[in-house]
Amino acid sequence: MIMKELIESIAKHLVDKPDEVNVADVETEQRIIYELTVGDGDYGKIIGKGGRNISAIRTIIFAINAKQGGKRARLDVID
């Protein structure tokens, strides 16, 4: 499973409108930026209380990326 699909799968399980979840990736020389967009009202569910959900998702992404030895990864949630 590629990283983009993993992010999308996790996000779809957290939101009320899974059909509106979209992940785009922007690659630069030094990093890959994943841009997650969700439907209206679902932004808070992705962020979670005190940022716990987004922090956990980012930790998983960083850990997998470090193990694979790829470019640095960043996850942005677009509202």
Give the residues covered by each predicted segment.
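RNA-contacting regions in translation and RNA-metabolism proteins
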Residues: 1-45, 53-79
